[in-house]
Amino acid sequence: MKSNQMILVCMMAIAFVCTSVPAWACSSAVISGKVTPDGRPLLWKNRETGHLKNHMVYVKGEKYDFVANVNSDNFPKLKEAWVGSNTAGFALMNTQSYNLEKGDIADDDRGPKNGEVIYRALEICATVADFCHFLDTITKPSGI
């Protein structure tokens, strides 16, 4: 019972924070398996984006199949995912922050690059070590 109460308190706090200030970045939460009934961690994501039409898809990946949230208006033409989990149990999500130093990357170029990286990682990564190796091998600057 304590686990359910802790999850409820966390979700209420997140909801309060997300609705009390204007937000132009994605909201997310990672909930430890220590407080879930089955011991598995939870990922929670809310997309605050101009792409209002989103849906979940099942993708036959190169190495691993996965379920992901995609923009409805440009999928499958663009291979972008914003949160997902693959058949190896690897899960990944993006949160876009617009208050960081931009450097040479325009806001319009930052989001889609995140989506491309997440889509590809869900196809080929099974572990955090795989993902670190993947990040080390992509062309820099990557636009993420």
Region locations from a protein language model:
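Bacterial N-terminal signal peptides that target proteins for export
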Residues: 1-10
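Bacterial N-terminal signal peptides
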Residues: 9-19
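Serine/proline-rich low-complexity intrinsically disordered segments, especially terminal tails, linkers
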Residues: 5, 20-22
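A generic structural signal for short, solvent-exposed coil/turn residues
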Residues: 15-17, 35, 84, 131
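A contiguous strand-loop segment
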Residues: 24-113, 137-144
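Sequence-pattern detector for short linear motifs
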Residues: 5, 48-50, 123
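A surface/extracellular/periplasmic glyco- and lipid-processing/surface-interacting theme
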Residues: 115-144
